[in-house]
Structures are given as structure tokens and as C-alpha cells.
């Protein structure tokens, strides 16, 4: 009866399979347990023999600590229930709780956490979850740390993006709230952003994924938390403009700033939707040239080649400063073969085309910002003489456009004055337009450039002779974010006596009634034929000593101190 009962349990469609074989299975050489031929290790847990090491992708890191540059502890945690590429943020902190006892009040510190997954936030606000969620538990046991990526200003200048995008990226990169881009996993990065209701911590996740299909071309996908996820694949080409968010450009800049990352993400850098020019990844090699033995031939052929190079550089002149263009021209002749006429070639190649020597508006504005930095010195009083610049009308038009940023219409001057100049050159009747800026953020927005951001405060140290010297505080350097943050977290920085100067704009003290303005004056057509006008910048700055406002004290050594010289002696020669 037993064989018949077994036969009845076999389904009808499996009745003609025949005798069972050992195809697809094999014995473990150690314990004899049958395992599948594709198995990596023995399924007998007490045995644990490893057959081969698979090349499978390592599982995504559960929790990674983000570098914030402060006491804020933020973690990027994987959401297990959604997939390996879905991550959330968890914030850990310490809260103080008082407990009343018979002996008195005891203050204890309790570790607290906040998970920013919508479901966990909703459950926490409603008081449904008594214990910590799984994301907070993963963050508490986290031992991994994110890798900060370097951002180079030269790469940012070479990006084909709007000036507002570059400016925002630079402002985020120079803020002391951690590096701009941090790598969490192979494809996922964390980027700083402006704090909002959706991203209250000021961070968001981005992912770069490339899928290679057998029948189709490689598919490159970029997703940012600031965008809504669209599952329709046919609209991928139409959504390229949407994908070009500021966080996408920040990641691309970080990739291009590192040679290893540039090779790893070369498909995204070379992709048309990246918005980058070919100068992003510079080629260090030089073109092979035939050696020239006479200076006459170098005077004809290299001139033509130089014109071609300069014309090629003109296409990027709106993004690259002239010094980088000239440096690229100089680099092209580094690896030439050494011949007898190399000295003659260098002498003939030093001629410059005057028509190609230009100064961009951002380079000039960077010089204005540097001038303001030099003026804000602790050794002098906070009321310097006005800074005077003679610039073309087009430069002031660009500056006035920056003054009007944030308003729908062009901002009108606070006052317009007509005056007659009789006692100084040039003589005549002129008009003076004056703008009063009373918001320090607007002043920074007007004067900030990628190469020279405006420093609202400047730190100094006092020398033994009473003079003051500029102190470079070890803050976040955009060119070496990884080294800087590693040093800050490992060892606290020893700082001397804090002596600072600060730009006085607006109300800088509680009892101040009228705000201190940052004044911009413009007198057009000082040189009417050349269309050159006169720009005057007036401002004040204050002094801080250990965080408190200090009155200016002139402690400079007097210049009329008598010098003590040794008496002269007479030397006789035989």
C-alpha cells in the first residue's frame, strides 16, 4: 500500500520523468552533503566549506556617517524595505532629562535620534512607536564614514552653466557645514543643498547608475531627491533639462576634479547632457611637432598655429579666465624636442597679440573684492578712504545687474546728484548715482566670485612689536576638502587670541538705530570718448576681540624712533 500511496502523491504531469539523476548537484568533498553546482559554499552550516568566491556585488552599506563640520551627527541609512539604492537621513543627538529623587535632582543625558523617513516621522509624531525604528538602530551602530570629494574652482569655471548656478555651487562649497559632495556607496552620493521643508537637514541623496543592455546602448540614469521620480522611460530625453539640477552639476564638478573619478564616471562626463565642455578633463600630453631649425620658419608657422589655438580658446573665453588660457598656450610647448634653435624659438614665441589680451568682468570684480580684503586690516581704523576704480560702462552695467538680483525690475539708485567740477580735473558737469546696500547678504551676493568670495570677517594675530598679521584659520579649503576634514575631526585646532575685523553693513549692534550702508557711487563718462566712468565704494568695518566688539586703538610703532647706531671707528691701512 505504501508504494501506491506514494505514486498517488506524484502529479500526473511528472509521472513520465524517468529515473532521478545527479544533474545539477554535487557532493561536498568535506561532509558529503548534496549542494547545487552553482552554490558558493556548502549549505551545511556546520561544514561551511567555500567552493568558490563569487563576483557578486557587495551589499550596500547599511549606514554611513556624513561629515558635517560641526557637532551635528547625520547618517545616511539604507531603507531595507525599498531596495539597495533607497536611503534616508537619520539625525542623532543627546538630550538632557531631569529626574527627581529623594537626594535631589539628577540630570542625565539620553541619546536621542530622529528618522526622516516619512512613515517613521508620522509614527513618531503620533506616538505610535515606543522603541527606536530600525533606521536609528542602524545609525547608532554605524562605523563607516562618507568620503568627501574635492571641488576645484578651475573645473567650476570651465562648466557650461549659468553664472547663478556657479555662484550657488561655490557658496555651498565654501560654507563650513561639511564638504559639498560626499560619496556614500559606488553609485550614491550626498550633496549639500539649501535647507527647505523637504530637506530640513540641508543634505540630499543623488545616484549615478549606468545599465548596459545586450540589445540597446548603455543607459545612463541620474536621480536626485530634489526631483520627482518618473518611471516612464520614453521621456528620458525630454527630461534632460530637468535632470540638470544644481546638485547634478556639483557632482559632475567633483568627478572632473579627480582623475580617478573622472575615469570612473567618464560616460557621464562625456555625455551630451552633462553640460560640460571638453576642457573639463585636461590632456597633459602635447601634440607632436616637427623640429624647426631656423627662426624665420618659426615666425610663420607657429604664428598660424597660435592663432588657431587662440581662436579655439575664444570659444571658452566667457568661462575661462585669460590667465588659464595663456597657461594652456604655454603648456603646449613643454615637451618639445631639445634642438639647437630652442632658445631662438622661445625668443620668437614670446610675442603677444595685443588684441587677445583681455580682462573679464569676474576677474576685475575679484580684484575689487581683494582690495576690500586688504582694506579690512586690524591695524587701522574702521573708516577707510573710498576705493576708487576707473572702469568701462559695460563693467558697471554688469555690476548693476548684480545689484538688481532678486528684484523683478532694475534697482534705481537711492540718490542722483548733478555737480560741477571746477577745482580738479576733469572739468565739467557730471552726474553721480548712489546706491545704499544695507543687507550684508546682498553685498556678498554682489561681490562674490568663484575665484575670490567675499570674506565678511578677517582674522589676525598680534605680533610682539604691536603690529598685526593676517591669520589664515584652517577652515574648509575647497581644493582639499578630504584632508582638511580628516584633520579637523582627528585633532582640535589650537587657535591664538581671536582678533577679527568684520564688515559693518546694516544694524550691527542692538542699540543702533540707523543701519550702516555699503555705498556704491558711479560717475559715468569721466572719459567720454573711451566710455570710462568712476566707481567709488565706501564702507566701514569693526573690530572684534575674543568675540566682543572692541574699540580701535592705534598700536602701531612710531616711525620717528631714533635708530641706535654703533660709533664709527677709524681704520688705518699701512
Curated annotation (Swiss-Prot):
Annotated organism of origin: Bos taurus
Polar residues bias (residue ranges): 312-330
InterPro entries named in the record: C2orf42 (IPR026049), Zf-tcix (IPR029269)
Pfam family, one: zf-tcix
Species lineage: Eukaryota, Metazoa, Chordata, Craniata, Vertebrata
Superkingdom of the source species: Eukaryota
One Gene Ontology term, aspect cellular component: nucleoplasm
Protein's name according to its UniProt entry: Uncharacterized protein C2orf42 homolog
Segments of this protein annotated with the region Disordered: 288-331
Amino acid at each position: 500500500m505504501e508504494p501506491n500511496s506514494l505514486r498517488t502523491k506524484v502529479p500526473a504531469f511528472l509521472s513520465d520523468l524517468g529515473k532521478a539523476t545527479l544533474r545539477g548537484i554535487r557532493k561536498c568533498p568535506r561532509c558529503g552533503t548534496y549542494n547545487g553546482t552553482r552554490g558558493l559554499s556548502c549549505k551545511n552550516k556546520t561544514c561551511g566549506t567555500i567552493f568558490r568566491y563569487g563576483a557578486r556585488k557587495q551589499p550596500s552599506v547599511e549606514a554611513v556617517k556624513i561629515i558635517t563640520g560641526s557637532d551635528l551627527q547625520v547618517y545616511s541609512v539604507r531603507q531595507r524595505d525599498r531596495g539597495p539604492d533607497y536611503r534616508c537621513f537619520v539625525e542623532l543627538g543627546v538630550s538632557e532629562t531631569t529626574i527627581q529623587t529623594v537626594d535631589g535632582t539628577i540630570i542625565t543625558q539620553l541619546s536621542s535620534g530622529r528618522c526622516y523617513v516619512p512613515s517613521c516621522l508620522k509614527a513618531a509624531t503620533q506616538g505610535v512607536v515606543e522603541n527606536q525604528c530600525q533606521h536609528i538602530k542602524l545609525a547608532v551602530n554605524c562605523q563607516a564614514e562618507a568620503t568627501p570629494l574635492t571641488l576645484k574652482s578651475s573645473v567650476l569655471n570651465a562648466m557650461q552653466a549659468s553664472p547663478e548656478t556657479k555662484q550657488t555651487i561655490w557658496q555651498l562649497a565654501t560654507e563650513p557645514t561639511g564638504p559639498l559632495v560626499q560619496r556614500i556607496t559606488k553609485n550614491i552620493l550626498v550633496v549639500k543643498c539649501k535647507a527647505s521643508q523637504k530637506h530640513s537637514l540641508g543634505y540630499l541623496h543623488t545616484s549615478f547608475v549606468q545599465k548596459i543592455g545586450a540589445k540597446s546602448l548603455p543607459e545612463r540614469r541620474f536621480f536626485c531627491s530634489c526631483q520627482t521620480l518618473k518611471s516612464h522611460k520614453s521621456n528620458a530625453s525630454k527630461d534632460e533639462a530637468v535632470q540638470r539640477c544644481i546638485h547634478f552639476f556639483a557632482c559632475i564638478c567633483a568627478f572632473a576634479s579627480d582623475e580617478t573619478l573622472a575615469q570612473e564616471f567618464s560616460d557621464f562626463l562625456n555625455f551630451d547632457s552633462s553640460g560640460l565642455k571638453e576642457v573639463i578633463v585636461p590632456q597633459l600630453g602635447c601634440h607632436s611637432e616637427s623640429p624647426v631649425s631656423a627662426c624665420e620658419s618659426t615666425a610663420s608657422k607657429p604664428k598660424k598655429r597660435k592663432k588657431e589655438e587662440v581662436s579655439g580658446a575664444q570659444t571658452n573665453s566667457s568661462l575661462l579666465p585669460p590667465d588659464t588660457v595663456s597657461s594652456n598656450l604655454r603648456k603646449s610647448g613643454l615637451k618639445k624636442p631639445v634642438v639647437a634653435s630652442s632658445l631662438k624659438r622661445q625668443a620668437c614665441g614670446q610675442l603677444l597679440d595685443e588684441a587677445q589680451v583681455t580682462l573679464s568682468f569676474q576677474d576685475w570684480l575679484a580684484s575689487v573684492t581683494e582690495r576690500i580684503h586688504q582694506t579690512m586690516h586690524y591695524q587701522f581704523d574702521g573708516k577707510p578712504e573710498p576705493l576708487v576704480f576707473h572702469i568701462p560702462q559695460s563693467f558697471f552695467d554688469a555690476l548693476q545687474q548684480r545689484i538688481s538680483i532678486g528684484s523683478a525690475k532694475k534697482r534705481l539708485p537711492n540718490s542722483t546728484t548733478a555737480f560741477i567740477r571746477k577745482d580738479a580735473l576733469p572739468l565739467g558737469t557730471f552726474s553721480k548715482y548712489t546706491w545704499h546696500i544695507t543687507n550684508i547678504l546682498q553685498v556678498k551676493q554682489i561681490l562674490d566670485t568663484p575665484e575670490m568670495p567675499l570674506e565678511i570677517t578677517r582674522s589676525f594675530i598680534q605680533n610682539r612689536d604691536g603690529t598685526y598679521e593676517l591669520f589664515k584659520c584652517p577652515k574648509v579649503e575647497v581644493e582639499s576638502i578630504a584632508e582638511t576634514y580628516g584633520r579637523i575631526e582627528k585633532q582640535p585646532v589650537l587657535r591664538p587670541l581671536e582678533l577679527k575685523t568684520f564688515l559693518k553693513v546694516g544694524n550691527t549692534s542692538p542699540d543702533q538705530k540707523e543701519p550702516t550702508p555699503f555705498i556704491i557711487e558711479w560717475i559715468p563718462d569721466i572719459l567720454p570718448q573711451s566710455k570710462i566712468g568712476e566707481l567709488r565704494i565706501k564702507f566701514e568695518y569693526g573690530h572684534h576681540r575674543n568675540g566682543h566688539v572692541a574699540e580701535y586703538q592705534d598700536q602701531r610703532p612710531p616711525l620717528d624712533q631714533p635708530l641706535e647706531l654703533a660709533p664709527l671707528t677709524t681704520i688705518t691701512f699701512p
